[in-house]
Amino acid sequence: MLAIASSVANATAADLPHFYGDAPDEHHPWAVHDGNRPQPPIVVPGTFSTQEQPGKPPSDAVILFDGTDLSKWEADNGPAGTPTKWVIKNGAMECVPGSGYIRTRDKFGDIQLHVEWASPTKVEGESQGRGNSGVFLLGLVEIQVLDNYHNPTYADGMAAAVYGQHAPLANALRPPGEFQSYDIAFRRPIYRDGREVDPGYVTVFENGVLVEDHALIEGETGHMRRAKPMHFPDAGPLKLQDHGNPVRYRNIWYRPLPPRESEGGTDGALTVEDTKAKRAELAASIRDDAQKLANPANPLPEMFRLAESLVYAQDDATSQKVQQMAAAYVDTLEGMPPDQRAQKKDEARHVREVFNYLVRFKVFPDTFAPRQKLQQIIKSQNWDKK
């Protein structure tokens, strides 16, 4: 990465702004390879499960069931707080047929969800009557749980189907009695003022195999009926279905997903209005940061930072100050004794790169005087000669 650096002993390239990739535009508040873009949080990965032992969740996961208690769950067929009749056996929660659905006490929206489940070892029934349950996202969108190991049924009702809407891309089930894993990325449909502003999608991996690829959520799932568009809530519980079979679950956890562009996220292409607002916010933050770098003995760090703010949003006072600082820098360089000026070769070439960047992305015009004068100095000193 090209970073603009000064010759000051206490400043490094990493301390100074980067003038590198394409500048922000009307739909992207960040520059390409933007040094101001926040670093992603560090997450310690978990471990994979075996049949004998559930894996360890990642460090930022919210644990919904760890094999020891049902304190985060309640019955779905009663008032809030009604205890479930599901039971815990050997580190797994087991559906008691006829007891009703179970749901989380908490509600959440867009998530990465991990669920492990096992149908009974003893095979009983066929088609939809064999090891049937379901994982309901927001309590509305069912990812089918079913023992389809050598057990055909209608495709949009097989294990890992978005029930009644999308058949799985593959049948990657293990034999009955063994634990299966679902890893789900769920993005709910987003509604504002009664209108859908962002569709919902779900991606599912079954035992590590991609079986739902960014499948469009057409509405609430249901049996024998076509899904219809509907207003989705921003948050809802996770539900597990009682379909009359003693299906077991273990190692259930989720990670909240970051907001999308339509709800304030800043990754991807934003609206013109949202981009403008974010760029103004970034420019103001960078200007505030520049104030901390003010140092008459070494003005370059402050000048670079102020100049960088102009890449995000124009500000007349800041533009004027950068032009004054740039002119002062070039005048000082020109007036130095030859031996002292020679020591500024690398620094001057870096400053020229900044000026070129600012001109290239229309922060300053082609006639930007400090740039022209600096180029003349560099040429007269043969500093571009290799």
Model-found features: residue ranges?
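Bacterial N-terminal signal peptides
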Residues: 1-7
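Carbohydrate-interacting regions of secretory-pathway proteins
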Residues: 11-386
